């Protein structure tokens, strides 16, 4: 009985510790509070919409290029690598959630064909493990092992990511077939401009909520600004600008509704790319090799037969 109580107490303590860790991590590293792809996992059953749009684009509004490299074809039950490239100028800095400047983080979601999944550690060759380094990949959900997510990671170290992938074997996986399959990639560098609830992050532009004249601008102690706009009917409307964006207006200036009050601090962006891969049937390859061998042998026999015929003709002419 005492052992059961002790186990319950230990379990409660572990749960409490994990909860506290989850709550305090964003406070210690505030720039991860808008990190991807955790928002997509929490809010969407699938990261790819019916239109082909990856949901990360809902929060990361700017477009930037990404690239993916995979083999043209793979054999069943084989480990191969998918190389994801998220290029950007590593010298640039982004606005963090506290308004300060810092390095960009990167992340990616890789949507594989059904049956393809993250390769088990004991199946990954040593040379591939070196390329992966200490990167932690995870499935999008327990039901969607073919969708892999990674990040956020320091962009200056991981602008190129290597995913270890295990191909399915149609002999044991009835859902897999020897076909050509599409692979979809979504990759991002930097923080998002919008939170999942639709509110703006401080990595966005801010505009005036009403038309009027800016009567007062007050810089806040923790950063950011309080902009008071006096309307034509004498009302005073206060717009709050969080730390990060810089004001591009001044006191006494007349402004219109929705006129920009700040610059655009965002230096990152999200991009999509796709590729194709063939799950190749080994018997098909063997059949192709046999066909090529038969063609080569037929050519050899044809040449030999021709030479033999020429020798016979030459002998008859000499006779």
UniProtKB/Swiss-Prot annotation:
Under InterPro entries, the record lists:
Cyt-f_TM, Cyt_f, Cyt_f_lg_dom, Cyt_f_lg_dom_sf, Rudment_hybrid_motif
Q: Which residues bind heme?
A: 36, 56, 59-60
Q: Source organism's superkingdom?
A: Eukaryota
State a GO cellular component annotated for this protein: chloroplast thylakoid membrane
The UniProt note on the cofactor reads as follows: Binds 1 heme group covalently.
Q: Which locations, inside or outside the cell, does it occupy?
A: Plastid, Chloroplast thylakoid membrane
Keywords of the record, alphabetical order, are: Chloroplast, Electron transport, Heme, Iron, Membrane, Metal-binding, Photosynthesis, Plastid, Signal, Thylakoid, Transmembrane, Transmembrane helix, Transport
The signal peptide stretch is 1-35
One GO biological process term is: photosynthesis
**Topology in membrane:** Single-pass membrane protein
Q: Which HAMAP family match?
A: Cytb6_f_cytF (MF_00610)
- Where exactly are the transmembrane stretches of this chain? 285-305
Gene Ontology molecular function = electron transfer activity; heme binding; iron ion binding
What does the function comment of this entry state? Answer: Component of the cytochrome b6-f complex, which mediates electron transfer between photosystem II (PSII) and photosystem I (PSI), cyclic electron flow around PSI, and state transitions.
Instruction: List the cofactors.
Output: heme
Its protein name is Cytochrome f
Instruction: From the record, give the cysteines joined by S-S bonds.
Output: none
Q: Which family does it belong to?
A: Belongs to the cytochrome f family.
How would you summarize the oligomeric state and partners of this protein?
A: The 4 large subunits of the cytochrome b6-f complex are cytochrome b6, subunit IV (17 kDa polypeptide, petD), cytochrome f and the Rieske protein, while the 4 small subunits are PetG, PetL, PetM and PetN. The complex functions as a dimer.
């Amino acid at each position: 009985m005492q052992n059961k109580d002790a186990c319950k107490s230990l379990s409660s303590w572990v749960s409490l510790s994990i909860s506290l860790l989850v709550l305090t991590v964003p406070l210690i590293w505030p720039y991860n509070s808008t990190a991807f792809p955790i928002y997509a996992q929490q809010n969407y059953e699938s990261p790819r919409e019916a239109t082909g749009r990856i949901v990360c684009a809902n929060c990361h509004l700017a477009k930037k290029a990404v690239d993916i490299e995979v083999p043209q074809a793979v054999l069943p039950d084989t480990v191969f690598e998918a190389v994801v490239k998220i290029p950007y100028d590593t010298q640039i800095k982004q606005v963090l959630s506290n308004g300060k400047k810092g390095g960009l983080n990167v992340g990616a979601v890789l949507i594989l064909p059904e049956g393809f999944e993250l390769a088990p550690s004991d199946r990954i060759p040593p040379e591939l493990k070196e390329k992966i380094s200490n990167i932690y990949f995870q499935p999008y959900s327990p039901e969607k092992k073919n969708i892999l997510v990674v990040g956020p990671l320091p962009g200056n170290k991981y602008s190129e990511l290597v995913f270890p992938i295990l191909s399915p074997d149609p002999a044991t996986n009835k859902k897999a077939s020897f076909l050509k399959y599409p692979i979809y990639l979504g990759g991002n560098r930097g923080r998002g401009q919008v939170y999942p609830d639709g509110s703006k992050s401080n990595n966005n532009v801010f505009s005036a909520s009403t038309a009027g004249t800016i009567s007062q601008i007050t810089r806040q102690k923790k950063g950011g600004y309080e902009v008071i706009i006096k309307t034509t009917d004498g009302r005073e409307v206060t717009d709050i600008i969080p730390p990060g964006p810089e004001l591009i207006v001044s006191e006494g200036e007349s402004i219109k509704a929705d006129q920009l009050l700040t610059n655009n601090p965002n230096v990152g962006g999200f991009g999509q790319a796709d590729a194709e891969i063939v799950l190749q049937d080994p018997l098909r390859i063997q059949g192709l090799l046999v066909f090529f061998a038969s063609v080569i042998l037929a050519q050899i026999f044809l040449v030999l037969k021709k030479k033999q015929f020429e020798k016979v003709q030459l002998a008859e002419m000499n006779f």
